[in-house]
């Protein structure tokens, strides 16, 4: 298994990521991984992950969207809970490969109050429902294909339309870590557990 790079973003690096988002994310590592996928529309990433130190985290991410069942949600619904946000779509091969691992992680961390939220970037509700049924997914997904509001909310953290990508938000709604490409269950467990263990407030 290739060794995964573990880096810590400084406040300067976080600001740079946000600036790159406004210019098309041309130098963002995630965008580079996306381009390496030869236009397959999914990341050729290797599960590289980044953690952000508490002192270097940017402002909370404010987001809103509509779930596949029509329910409206906002970031306020997730404040106070460590939240795992996974960007995906049904025909993305790495997304299918990681689906059961994400579901298992959601069950494992549920006793700690961790919430999971999918963000589907290409499909309509019937496709999302079919995918969830096939892979046993029980956590909800936002339909983001029409207005891309979730992708815009996370601009600077992920590249537009690049999937899969997984973001861990701390209890304040700030980005604590991200994984580019298919998750490694052990890595995700560590990222989530580290964030859960942080002092509240």
What does each model-identified segment do?
Residues 73-96, 102, 116:
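Short active-site neighborhood of thiol/selenol oxidoreductases, capturing the structured segment around
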Residues 96-136, 146-153:
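Structural microenvironment flanking redox-active thiols in thiol-disulfide oxidoreductases
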Residues 1-62, 201:
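N-terminal targeting signals for export/organelle localization
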Residues 23, 68-70, 171:
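Short, ordered coil/turn segments that flank beta-strands lining enzyme active or ligand-binding pockets
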Residues 53-83:
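A short beta-strand-turn-helix
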Residues 87-89, 119-122, 144-145, 182:
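Active-site-proximal beta-strand/loop segments in catalytic clefts of secreted hydrolases
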Residues 130-137, 145-200:
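Thiol/disulfide oxidoreductase modules built on the thioredoxin-like
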């Amino acid at each position: 298994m290739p060794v995964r790079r573990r880096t810590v973003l400084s406040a300067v690096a976080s600001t740079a990521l946000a600036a790159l988002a406004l210019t098309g994310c041309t130098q963002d590592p995630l965008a580079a991984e996306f381009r390496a996928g030869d236009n397959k529309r999914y990341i050729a990433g290797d599960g590289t992950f980044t953690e952000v130190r508490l002192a270097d985290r940017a402002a909370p991410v404010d987001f809103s969207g509509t779930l596949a069942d029509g329910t409206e949600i906002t970031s306020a619904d997730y404040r106070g809970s460590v939240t795992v946000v996974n960007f995906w779509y049904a025909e993305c091969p790495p997304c299918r490969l990681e689906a059961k691992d994400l579901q298992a992680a959601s069950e494992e961390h549920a006793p700690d109050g961790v919430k999971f939220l999918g963000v589907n970037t290409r499909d309509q509700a019937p496709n999302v429902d079919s995918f969830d049924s096939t892979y046993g997914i029980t956590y909800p997904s936002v339909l983001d294909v029409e207005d891309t509001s979730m992708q815009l909310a996370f601009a600077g953290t992920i590249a537009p339309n690049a999937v899969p990508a997984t973001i861990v938000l701390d209890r304040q709604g700030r980005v604590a870590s991200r994984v580019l490409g298919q998750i490694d269950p052990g890595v995700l467990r560590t990222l989530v557990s580290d964030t859960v263990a942080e002092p509240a407030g």
